[in-house]
Structures are given as structure tokens and as C-alpha cells.
Regions:
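Charge-rich alpha-helical segments
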Residues: 1-103
């Protein structure tokens, strides 16, 4: 799983063990229940900074009580290690804020 351009198999995605992340078509999705808009905004800001650093940008939805995240690698029309790495980073940001992804 080291080639950042290689589309991952379903088995590799399962092996990654991303709690709260789901395979939706050719993307990984997660919904983080932030309970407050200010917490959601902080999570979005942290995700944005990490996405810029990684040069890999998720689709985000911010609502009053949750943040939705969709990750995919458009260049390969699927999920790569870049998505797995960013999902782990995002989950870490959420945990730091006391927020969990919906199962």
C-alpha cells in the first residue's frame, strides 16, 4: 500500500481499520457528530489545514451539529493510500476535539 497512485482493493480498505468510515461508491465517507456549530467549524478548519499540507482535498459539509467528509482520489477514480492517510488524520483531529464518527 505504498504507491500513492494505486487504487486500493476492498480487502486493503477493510485492513486499514478506519472506525466510522464507510465505503460509498468509489469514496470513503464519514459523519462526525460535533453537537455544536463552533466545534464543527474548528474541525473543518483543522481538516482544511491538513488537506492543504497533504495537497489532497476532501469534500466537506458543515451543518449545525455535524461535519460530513468524503474522500476519493479523482485521478484514479477510487480510493488510494492518500485517502486512508487523510482519513486517519481527520479522525485524529476529531478525537482531539472529543468528537466521534457515526458508526
Amino acid at each position: 500500500m505504498t504507491d500513492p497512485q494505486r487504487k486500493l482493493s476492498a480487502a486493503e480498505l477493510t485492513e486499514a481499520g478506519l472506525t466510522g468510515w464507510h465505503l460509498t461508491g468509489e469514496a470513503l465517507t464519514a459523519t462526525f457528530k460535533t453537537r455544536k456549530f463552533s466545534t464543527g467549524l474548528e474541525l473543518v478548519n483543522r481538516i482544511g489545514a491538513s488537506a492543504e499540507e497533504a495537497n489532497h482535498h476532501p469534500d466537506l459539509t458543515l451543518t449545525y451539529r455535524e461535519v460530513g467528509v468524503t474522500l476519493t482520489s479523482h485521478d484514479v477514480s477510487g480510493i488510494t493510500i492518500r485517502d486512508i492517510d487523510l482519513a486517519r488524520t481527520i479522525s485524529g483531529h476529531a478525537a482531539d476535539l472529543g468528537v466521534a464518527a457515526e458508526e
